Amino acid sequence: MKHVATCALCALATAPAVAQPAVAQEAFDLDTITVIANQTATALERSGSTVEIIPATEVQAAPRARLGDFLTFQPGITSSANGPLGTTSTVRIRGLGGAYVPVLIDGIDVTDPASSGGGFDFGGLTNAGLGRIEILKGSQSARFGQNAVGGVINIESLRPTEDGMHGFAEVEAGSLDFRRGVLGLTARTARTDLAFSFSRTETDGFSASAFGTEDDGFEASQANLYFRHQVSDILAAGLSALYIDSRAEFDEFGGDGAPPFDEFNKTEATGLRGFVELQTGAVSHEVALSHFESDRVSNSNGVASPFKGERRRVDYRGSYDTGGIWSLNFGADYTEEEDLNQKIDIVGVQTELLIAPTDTLDLAFSVRNDDHSEFSSELSSRAALSWRARPDLIVRASVSDGFRAPTLTQLDPFFGDPDFQPETSLSYDLGVEKRLDGGFLRATLFYTEIDNQIFFDGNSTRCPSGFGCFEKGDFEARGLELSGRVAINAFLTLDAAYTYTDADQNGERAARVPRHDVALGLGAQITPRIDAQFTVQHVADVEPSSFAPPVNKVGDYTLFHVNANYALTDAVTAYLRVENLFDEDYETAGGFNTSGRAGFVGLRASF
C-alpha cells in the first residue's frame, strides 16, 4: 500500500547555500584523510582498504530524512525498513547487515548488546546534528575485533570548523505531519574544540504494515556533545556523549495490532566516552573509557517486553613513528557486554605495521587476537596495499579475515544454542581509481565468505521458542562497485554509483539484497544564491525474505528525489526537499509500507 502526502506548512530546515551533489562522495584531494582504515589517520590515497567518505556538509544537506536511506547513495550500501521513520531499518555493506557492521558515533560503539542480532537499528536516526561519516568495507576484525565482518560505519557529531563561538538553528516541517527542530553550538580556540547539538523529531508517519490502516508515528530527542582540550604540547583530553530518547510505533507481520493499536518501542540510549592523549617523543598514546547503555521496552498488544543492554570498554592505543619508511601501531582493550540474562567479556590485543617502501607504495599489515569469555581465542589478520601507478591512477587491494561471536540472545537456549561457535569470514577486494580534473572514476571487485553463519529460521522447531530458532549455515557475496564524479562545468556536477551483488545464504539467494543498485545525482549551482540537487535511485532483482507474505512488492523500483536551497542572506537559507517525486509504490521489506511522495520545507539560520 502506498501513502501519498503533500507538503505541509513552511518552517525551517537544514541546507547550506552551496551545491551538494546528491550522490555524496568526497572529492578526491591529497588533504582528504581516513581515520578508521588504519589505527592512525591516513591520507585516503595511501589506504589500501576501500573507504567511502561523506563530508559533514553533504550529511547536513541529505535529501532523505532517515540517515540509512541517505547512505544508500554510496556504492555497495543498501537498506531495508519495516515501515516509516522509527521502525526497524537495516543498512547492509556488500550484502551484510547490521549484525556484521559495527556503528560508532564519536568513538562510542552504539550497536545494541540486547538485540537478537547485536546490530544497530538505523530506523530512527536522522542527519540532525551529525557530521562527517566514513564507511570502511570488508572484514575489519583485525582493526575492530568481533562483528566487523562486513565493515564499519564511523559517524561524527557536530564539530567546530572555525575559531570563535558559532551556532545554527533550524526547523523543518512537511508531509506526514513531520516536524523537526535542531540547535547546534560550537566553540574553538587555539587549544579547545567544543560542540553541542540537540534535535527533536516528530511525525505521524503512515501504517507500517502493508495491510494496516492506522498511522505509526515516531518522536525522538537526541543530544550530542564533543569536547577536546590540548592541555599542553604533549597532553590532550576530551570526552564525547550522546543521549537518545524515542518512541516508535510499529506493526507486526500481517497488519495492525489489536485495538487500540498500541504496538510501540520506547527506547532510551546513553553513551559516554572519555579519552587522554599523550605524546612521548616518537611514541603517542591514547587511553579511552566508554560506556553505552540501551534500555528498550517493546509493547505489543498490551504486553510489555523489556530489553536492556550495556557495554563497558577500556582502550589503549599506541603508535611508534620512526620518521622513516615504517611505523608501528599497537593496542589492547577490554570489553564487557550484558543483557538482562547474561554477561560476557572480551580481551583484545592488536598490532599494525605500516610500510612505505617507495613514495608510490603503501603496505599495511594488521593482526589482532580476541579472547572471548565463552570461546577460545580468535586471531584476525588483514593486509592492504595502495599503489600510485601514476599521479592520476591508484590501485588498491586488501585481503582480510574476521570473526563474529554469537550474541547473548543467540546463546540463549530458548532461541538459540549455548554451543554455537563464532562465525569466521574471509574477504578481499581489488580496485582501481582514476583521478579526473574535479572528479574521479573508481571500480572495485569484492568477495566475502562466512562459515558457520548464525541466522534465524522461522520454521525451525529445535528450540522451545515456538516461533523459530537460530541456526547455522554459510554465506557468500561477490560483486562489483563502480562510482565516479565528473564536473561537467563550473555549475554542474554529476555523481554516479552502481553495485552488482551476488549474495547467497546456504546455497540460496540472500534476501533483501539487490543484485543491481544504481544511483545518479546532479548538483546544479543555478545562481549565486540558488542551488539544487536531483537524485535517481534504481534497484532491481531483489529476493523477498521467507517472512514476506505471498503478495508483496519487493522487487524493482525507481525513486526520484529533489532538494533545493535559496540563500535569503549570508546567514539564512530556505530549503525545499521532495522524496519519491513520482510516487513510486514499492517495498524494501515484504509486507511493510514505504512512503509515497513527501515534501518538506524550511529555513536554517546561522549565527
Regions found by a protein language model. Give the residues of each.
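Periplasmic-side early beta-strands and strand-to-turn transitions of outer-membrane beta-barrels
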Residues: 141-142, 154-156, 160-164, 168-172, ...
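Conserved C-terminal beta-signal and adjacent last beta-strands/turns
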Residues: 5-7, 186, 230, 511-607
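N-terminal periplasmic accessory domains that precede
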Residues: 67-70, 89-92, 101-104, 120-125, ...
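N-terminal Sec signal peptide and the immediately downstream disordered periplasmic leader
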Residues: 1-74, 186-187, 233, 486
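Gram-negative outer-membrane beta-barrel transporters
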Residues: 356-360, 447, 470-545, 573, ...
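Extracytoplasmic beta-strand/coil segments of soluble accessory domains associated
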Residues: 36, 68, 72-109
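Outer-membrane beta-barrel signature, preferentially recognizing the C-terminal barrel domain
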Residues: 256-275, 279, 307-310, 342, ...
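Short acidic/polar hinge/loop motifs at secondary-structure boundaries
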Residues: 109-137
